[in-house]
């Protein structure tokens, strides 16, 4: 088992090698924002209870949350749990794109997280020595299917706690103002025709086709990870595999076509994308500046609700078409990269407190309603409340109609370093300072080199 000192040394060496930094000039700023987020969330976190309810745990919970967009909801839910049970719950939220960095740093401390998450098999490989075996726990027994369990041999080391979808969030009202409906978009060619027509009439219409494809650390994951999933998925489908140490790049021309469509038909010049943020993209969509916004079901509460400009009737989500496969029967990109893991190095009391908190979140009225209504989650547990999320409903409707969801194969990407290399190449390509060949090199050669490093570790 690795020691705290070993983790500290690993953090230092990985950061020195640039393995955990954001791409381009964003590394220092995103690392700084991660620290600020951690400090702010810690300060806002646990609350002492006045009248504890029944609980078997005498310990405390420290949850290192992956999702900044759900921070407020997690803080509120933690407070409710503490008020009901008397068990202190601290929620710390890492800044966007900085989870692994923050996790490495926090796990090196004496008061390390008791609850953290990994993104799938690749993430588990890095952290399995710290993961408590969840086999036989109450939360494991509440799963609707073992397919949501992350296993290493006979041990259940992670549990998927949310199923999500991503695609093209679409403002139906603006689309109709441009003379189209969602029924007009069933393929890449359809999407290209609509987007380029909107661009040609941009001054007349008063809006663009796509929000800015921001490539700073708060936004580039949408393209170096989520958009990159599409060519990986279709290559895996063609080759009949679910993982590889040597991606071929069969569909990288299609990746180029969709990325070109985004950056050449958006709210800003492609050369400006290096400095554009996730907030920029969201605000453009909120302000009716664009029809399409590539993002996921987790964005629902940022767009709909009190003080928000949209209702469910205004929005839907379309598949990300790249011109491959049976597009008429393609669904949204649906899956999970969110697996809860319990720190087995925590005290027995803290482990038990954490297990109780996890089970309460997915089984109690307060927990399940908060996860469905406040966070917009679909959770794979027996007591799940149906989510009001319009994007979740879109996924269900497509699946019921026989459309095939695109699997989340990005959990097989070899490393964060690989993602950052692809992100840097995409940013340079958009700015005109790099070529698409550089993207292909980062994608294919970078994959092979990172996979080799993993094999040698």
Language-model-derived ranges and their functions:
Residues 84, 178, 267, 307-373:
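Extracytoplasmic/periplasmic substrate-recognition and gating elements
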Residues 176, 200, 366-368, 383-387, ...:
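Conserved C-terminal helix/tail region of periplasmic/extracytoplasmic solute-binding proteins
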Residues 8-9, 24-123, 139, 274, ...:
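Conserved N-terminal structural module of periplasmic/extracytoplasmic solute-binding proteins
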Residues 80-145, 157, 173-179, 186, ...:
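Extracytoplasmic "Venus flytrap"/periplasmic binding protein-like
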Residues 106, 113-114, 140-175, 206-208, ...:
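A structural signal for short loop-to-beta-strand junctions that line the ligand-binding cleft
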Residues 195-196, 241-275:
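Glycine-centered hinge/linker elements that transmit conformational signals in sensory
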Residues 50, 157-159, 166, 192-244, ...:
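Extracytoplasmic/periplasmic solute-binding protein
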Residues 50-55, 119-167, 222, 226, ...:
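Hinge/lid segment of periplasmic solute-binding proteins
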């Amino acid at each position: 088992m690795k020691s705290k000192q070993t983790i500290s040394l690993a953090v230092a060496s990985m950061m020195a090698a640039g393995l955990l930094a954001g791409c381009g000039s964003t590394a220092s700023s995103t690392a700084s924002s991660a620290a600020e987020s951690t400090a702010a969330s810690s300060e806002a976190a646990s609350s002492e209870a006045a009248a504890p309810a029944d609980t078997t745990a005498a310990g405390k919970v420290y949850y290192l949350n992956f999702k900044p967009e759900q921070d407020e909801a997690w803080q509120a839910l933690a407070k409710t749990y503490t008020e009901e049970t008397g068990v202190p719950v601290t929620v710390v939220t890492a800044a966007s794109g900085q989870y692994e960095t923050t996790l490495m740093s926090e796990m090196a401390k004496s008061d390390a997280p008791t609850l953290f998450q990994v993104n799938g098999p690749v993430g588990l490989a890095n952290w399995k020595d710290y993961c408590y075996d969840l086999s036989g726990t109450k939360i494991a027994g509440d799963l609707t299917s073992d397919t949501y369990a992350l296993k290493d041999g006979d041990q259940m080391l992670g549990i998927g706690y949310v199923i999500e979808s991503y695609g093209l969030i679409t403002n139906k009202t603006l689309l109709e103002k441009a003379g189209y409906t969602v029924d007009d978009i069933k393929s890449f060619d359809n999407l290209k025709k609509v987007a380029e027509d909107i661009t040609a009439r941009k001054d007349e219409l008063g809006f663009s086709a796509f929000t800015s494809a921001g490539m700073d650390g708060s936004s580039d994951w949408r393209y170096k990870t989520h958009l990159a999933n599409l060519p990986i998925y279709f290559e895996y489908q063609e080759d009949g595999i679910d993982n590889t140490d040597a991606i071929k790049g069969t569909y990288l021309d299609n990746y180029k076509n969709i990325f070109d469509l985004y950056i050449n038909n958006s709210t800003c010049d492609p050369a400006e994308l290096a400095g554009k943020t996730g907030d920029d993209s969201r605000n453009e969509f909120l302000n009716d500046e664009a029809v399409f916004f590539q993002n996921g079901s987790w964005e629902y509460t940022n767009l709909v609700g009190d003080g928000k400009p949209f209702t469910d009737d205004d929005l839907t989500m379309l598949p990300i078409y790249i011109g491959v496969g049976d597009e008429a029967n393609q669904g949204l990109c649906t899956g999970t990269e969110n697996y809860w893991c319990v720190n087995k190095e925590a005290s027995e009391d803290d482990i038990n407190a954490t297990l109780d908190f996890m089970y309460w979140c997915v089984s109690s009225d307060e927990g399940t309603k908060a996860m469905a209504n406040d966070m917009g989650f679909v959770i794979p547990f027996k007591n799940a409340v149906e989510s009001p999320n319009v994007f979740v409903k879109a996924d269900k409707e497509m699946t019921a109609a026989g459309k095939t969801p695109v699997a989340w194969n990005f959990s097989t990407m070899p490393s964060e370093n690989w993602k950052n290399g692809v992100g840097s190449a995409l940013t340079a390509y958009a700015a005109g300072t790099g070529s698409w060949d550089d993207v292909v090199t980062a994608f294919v050669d970078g994959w092979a080199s990172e996979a080799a490093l993993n094999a040698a570790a």
